[in-house]
Amino acid sequence: MDKLIIKGGKKLIGEVSVSGSKNAALPIFVSTILAPGLNEIRNVPFLRDINTTIKVLESLGAVVEGNGNIVRIDTTHVNNVEATYDLVKTMRASVLVLGPLLARHGRARVSLPGGCAIGARPINLHLKGLAALGADIRLEHGYVEAKAKKLKGARINFDISTVGGTEQLMMAAALAKGETVLENAAREPEIIDLAEILIKMGAKIDGAGTDTIRITGVKELAPVAHDVMPDRIEAGTFMVAAAITGGDIKIRNMKLEHLDALVFKLQDAGVEITNRDNVVRVKGPRRPKAVNIKTRPYPGFPTDMQAQFMALMCVADGASVISENIFENRFMHVSELLRFGADITVEGSTATVKGVKKLSGAPVMATDLRASASLILAGLAADNTTEISRIYHLDRGYESIEKKLAGLGADIQRVKE
């Protein structure tokens, strides 16, 4: 197993380029099931979750070839409708194959998913929505079994904003008979990216990016080529890396408008952010100011940036209050940040962070994907050496992050334990 060794205290200086978005790429890959033939997906990041998705698609009958950041997916012979536990258990997004398989073949058998250990993340909203489209849904022996001769459009109001649920039903409804209206739909940029490839394929979708999405079903979809959007969470992580080290970096291949809530909070903390010719410059202060945050569905502050922002607040001047309103059990990084000398107290879904002048390097252990990033950030800012173990979480969502940080002057290396 690999671990990261970081010798902290260096300001990050230079330029870095953001990879394609994992959270956009996964549903885009799955959407190719709906369009039999050869689809080409570009700007694909090299990540463990991408490889898992490829294995799921191959198990269903797809032929997948990769060349650099371009992946070609031939879904002509996707005739198997079962995604087994061995494949699905490692990644929650695998459950997204349910809707497309149901829409294309009229049946699907998909194992209940695994993935990050962040609360329950129930898929009941997916299943409730598919049932509203006319599917017969049963849970048997850890599998979701779904059947429908032909899905039919319906009006579906989500109890809570759900990114996966919105993606699932947008794909399923693309081939349903009649109009489907998704109310209280998720508004994330990744939803828009998925809608864009579906529209290229021939789907009729209006309102992606708003809380009401209308999908008029069509008889068939055709294969296409598509570029995955930049990863806004990776971009945000680099922004915080510049801020926490007092650095000065330029970030390419990012869309700043996807991170408005984070940008406002970083600016409140004293970080200078400018956008010129689609290159974002981030200049960290001598010491950040304490700022309160509350995670919200997009366009609010992203839950996937909460852990990284907490690391920044650990060295801020003053006390900050961080409220996690999206996922339960998403403060697992706190116990590890305390090992750096951070001053954090947790009560329910709220953490109070009293900034200290300096963190001290320590041996720590990653617990999930974004927690891994927060520990790297703390290590970059800390005195002495930090060792981070269990970094396999990191490889699920960040493409060569240690190489990119080293390119900005960080003293960071991956070694075998």
Curated annotation (Swiss-Prot):
One GO process term, biological-process aspect: cell division
2-(S-cysteinyl)pyruvic acid O-phosphothioketal: modified positions: C116
GO MF term set: UDP-N-acetylglucosamine 1-carboxyvinyltransferase activity
Pathway in which this enzyme or protein is active: Cell wall biogenesis; peptidoglycan biosynthesis
Gene3D superfamilies documented for this protein: Enolpyruvate transferase domain (3.65.10.10)
Residue stretches spanning the membrane: none
Catalytic activity: phosphoenolpyruvate + UDP-N-acetyl-alpha-D-glucosamine = UDP-N-acetyl-3-O-(1-carboxyvinyl)-alpha-D-glucosamine + phosphate
Binding site for phosphoenolpyruvate: K22, N23
Location of this chain's protein in the cell: Cytoplasm
Family: Belongs to the EPSP synthase family. MurA subfamily.
Protein name per the record: UDP-N-acetylglucosamine 1-carboxyvinyltransferase
Major site of localization recorded for this protein: cytoplasm
NCBIfam families found in the cross-reference section: murA (TIGR01072), PRK09369.1 (NF006873)
Catalytic residues, chain numbering: C116
Entry superkingdom: Bacteria
Keywords of this entry: Cell cycle, Cell division, Cell shape, Cell wall biogenesis/degradation, Cytoplasm, Peptidoglycan synthesis, Pyruvate, Transferase
EC number(s) per entry: 2.5.1.7
UniProt keyword Iron-sulfur, yes or no: no
InterPro entries named among the record's database cross-references: Enolpyruvate_Tfrase_dom (IPR001986), Enolpyruvate_Tfrase_sf (IPR036968), MurA_subfamily (IPR050068), RNA3'P_cycl/enolpyr_Trfase_a/b (IPR013792), UDP_GlcNAc_COvinyl_MurA (IPR005750)
Species: Geobacter sulfurreducens (strain ATCC 51573 / DSM 12127 / PCA)
Described purpose of this protein according to its UniProt entry: Cell wall formation. Adds enolpyruvyl to UDP-N-acetylglucosamine.
Cell division recorded as keyword: yes
